[in-house]
Amino acid sequence: MLEQRCRGPTAMGPAQPWLFSGPSQESSQPDRGLRYQGKSAQPRGQTPGKVHRCAHCRKRFPGWVALWLHARRCQARLPLPCHECNQRFRHAPFLALHLQVHASAVPDLGFICHLCGHSFRGWVALVLHLRAHSASKRPITCPECDRRFWRQKQLRAHLRRCQPPVPEARPFICGNCGRSFAQWDQLVVHKRVHVAEALEEAAAKALGPRPRGRPAAPRPGGDAVDRPFQCACCGKRFRHKPNLIAHRRVHTGERPHQCPECGKRFTNKPYLTSHRRIHTGEKPYPCTECGRRFRHKPNLLSHSKIHKRLEVSAQAAPHPESHQIAAEPMAQPALGVPLGSPRTPAEAPALLHSCSDCGRSFRLERFLRLHQRQHTGERPFACTECGKNFGKKTHLVAHSRVHSGERPFACEECGRRFSQGSHLAAHRRDHAPERPFVCPDCGKAFRHKPYLAAHRRIHTGEKPYVCPDCGKAFSQKSNLVSHRRIHTGERPYACPDCDRSFSQKSNLITHRKSHIRDGAFCCAICGQTFDDEDRLLMHQKKHDA
């Protein structure tokens, strides 16, 4: 009867004849057990003798003799032996279960619990019963149902199954319709609907249909007559109706004109036309004095003031011959000329502040100082959190949002928020279906220009990132950062199961598979192994049922 009870679990897997072997099987020859073990490991549909797998390390062998020779070495490495049948185990829970089967197997009563004396017909029922006794030793308790767990991760998985989802807080309420939202930007987008409705109603009242016939005669009234189109939100007036329509988009947030290159949106078409010159490189406004070209007309007007100022200062300066005739009047300031203006044409160009490194000129000295930091590498603005230095204050402000978590730039399509406007502009291209950046060599298209630049290095063979330690060059900066860890000895990827750390993430992934082969996530009831703990928890539900 005992032999029948102990022989039953062998159908569940190759590890069961060793794990739950009774006293009557101690005298059996090892080669017979190994031969049975090798046959049980054969997959269906294969001829006998083709595949034999070790129950401990899952290694496969072509014949049972090779398996038997390997098993002697494999068992010798297992640290925990059973004193009843000399069976060895890698983990203490497996040995404890194995010893309980030896102690509980009684021919007449079946399997008896050594703690409370309860008897069971099968060993699986005994193991499930023993888990109830061991539950009191688990340190983590569920606050809802008093169930205990070994790990915090098991408690979190249990709470997700048992506790109902907490409703999301929606503190932002619309004052017009009472609808609530979880985030402020969602409420702002929603309120545009009410603003558009109010604009339509106000436009229908203020801009009603004019009676047919001759146009109405101008009436005295000043701005109301000259600018008949008034905004219902802010009261601003316009001469033409298209200007009013374009102005309404300031209140509604509508931006119908989208750039096909980068996806940025604008309220007016002239803004889009001016923006597209950044991508095309067009500079239609030339300077008549020096020939320099500008992308926008305001930039040309600002630049032309430099030439006018130089021309006025040159005309106000005295003739060079007057230095020889009358030197004393030179000490008096000329009429109509500021005290700080230059005196000679040779000194006139001093108004332009030129960079001594690259020759670039600037109108103000502070602009020159900001520019010279690019050559000197000076970074006077330091972050108080991490100590990182920046050359411009705007860069420090943008970096500080990394520590504060502030993300003021929100996407209108999906609501995702970003800490910098450039990141939002790059994200908008993900919503655009087109891929404007096309490789001229192979025709592959990309959404972002940096991706195209990195791809083109494949065709050109360019490797601009050079290691300062060994001189090895790379095409991408991430590869250089990963390579430099060889020289610095940095190992940022640590294994959570042991004390080893690695310089590459791929090496950590390969290393963690060794823990899985050792049975890191192994079921204590049936011995089945899993790649991660979540799958093990899902598997244990079958035994609980």
Curated annotation (Swiss-Prot):
Disruption phenotype: Conditional knockdown in the whole animal, the liver, or in adipose tissue leads to a reduction in body weight and body fat mass despite normal food intake; animals exhibit an increased insulin sensitivity. Furthermore, conditional knockdown in the whole animal leads to reduced levels of inflammatory infiltrates in adipose tissue, conditional knockdown in adipose tissue leads to a reduction in adipocyte size and higher oxygen consumption, and conditional knockdown in the liver leads to higher oxygen consumption and activity, a reduction in liver triacylglycerol levels and adipocyte size.
Sites bearing N6-acetyllysine, chain numbering: K39, K269
The keyword Acetylation is annotated on this UniProt entry: yes
GO cellular component, one term: cytosol
Zinc finger regions, C2H2-type: 52-74, 80-102, 111-133, 140-162, 172-194, 229-251, 257-279, 285-307, 353-375, 381-403, 409-431, 437-459, 465-487, 493-515, 521-543
Region (Disordered): 1-50
InterPro entries recorded: Znf_C2H2_sf, Znf_C2H2_type
Modified residues (Phosphoserine): S27
Entry-linked PROSITE patterns: ZINC_FINGER_C2H2_1 (PS00028), ZINC_FINGER_C2H2_2 (PS50157)
Protein keywords: Acetylation, Cytoplasm, DNA-binding, Metal-binding, Nucleus, Phosphoprotein, Repeat, Zinc, Zinc-finger
One BP annotation, GO: regulation of fatty acid transport
Keyword Membrane: no
Pfam families in UniProt: zf-C2H2 (PF00096)
Expression triggers: Increased in bone tissue of an iron-overload-induced and in an ovariectomy-induced mouse model of osteoporosis (at protein level).
GO-annotated molecular function: sequence-specific DNA binding; zinc ion binding
Subcellular location: Nucleus; Cytoplasm, Cytosol
Biological role: Sequence-specific double-stranded DNA-binding protein. Binds ATT-rich and T-rich DNA sequences and facilitates DNA bending. May regulate the expression of genes involved in cellular fatty acid import, including SCARB1/CD36, and genes involved in lipid droplet formation. May regulate the expression of LCN2, and thereby influence iron metabolism and apoptosis-related pathways. May regulate the expression of genes involved in glucose transport.
Quaternary assembly: Homodimers and homomultimers. Found in a complex with RIP60 and RIP100.
Protein name: DNA-binding protein REPIN1
Organism, as annotated: Mus musculus
Gene this chain is encoded by: Repin1
